Amino acid sequence: MRPVAPKPGKRVLLERIGFIWKHLSFSQKNTFRNLFRYKKRLIMTVFGIGCTTGLMVVGFGLKDSIMNIASLQYDNIQLYDAMAALNTDETDKLDDPDKTLNEIMENESGIETFAKVSMKSMDISSGSNVRTAYTVVCKDAQALESMMVFQSRTTKKTYELTDDGVILTEQMAEALGVGEGDTVSITSGENAPVTAVVAHVMENYLMHYVYMTEGCYEKVFQTEPEYNMYWLKLNKDGRANEDALGQRLMDHDEILTVTYVSTTREMIDGMLSSLY
């Protein structure tokens, strides 16, 4: 009347290794039996664990890369601390704008050094590829050396701004499909496009930029640049009292706004922190 006993199951290889098998729990023994007996389950288990581990590695790598963007940009490339936008309606009234504005900056003890720049949004194109970028022209290229690092991302070779060509940021150069020695078209507003030679391609992580000297700008556009901004590098005291410094600068009619890199960094870090 007793039911027929089931056929004895096949023993897996691990069962023959007694000193290991005896120390396994029931659930562990059951797991190993299922894995060795059912090859599809074994393959799916190994494949699943491998894919999951791979995704975790990629995820952690992306997190580290993304979270370091602000630090890479503002600690290694753009080294200035603030941007003071000029009120051109007021500066145009001055007999000697450079002298007046330079005196304003020099009288602020919190400002270590400064550079007068022209910064405008323009369309950069090559063939059918078009990107919008900030075109930056510095009145004194040497003054920019302490505020910008023009270098290759891969070799870390540093570049100098010259009148022979422009420096493009890497992501834009890739999007346009251009490199050193190629030419790009630059369109400012409703004006006809002009062409410029790409002298170098530089490391960059936030937004697109085209950098050129005053001489290069005049050669390309056949006109003088309109300077509308000062880049400021602050000392320790200036960084500790940014609000007060900004307010004093904006008390001058010639200064329209003051924007701090620290504020931009906080905004970027805040947006990125929401990703995890």
Where are the regions a protein language model picked out?
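Short, conserved charged micro-motifs
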Residues: 91-100, 237-247
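Peri-transmembrane interface segments
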Residues: 62, 66-75, 242-276
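Juxtamembrane segments of multi-pass membrane proteins
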Residues: 26-163, 170-171, 182
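Hydrophobic secondary-structure segments that place a key small or acidic residue at a functional site
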Residues: 157-216
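Alpha-helical transmembrane segments of integral membrane proteins
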Residues: 1-44
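Small-residue-enriched segments and motifs
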Residues: 133, 184, 196-199, 229, ...
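Small-residue transmembrane helix packing/gating motifs
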Residues: 77-78, 160-161, 201-243, 262
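Envelope-exposed proteins and targeting segments
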Residues: 80, 131, 164, 182, ...
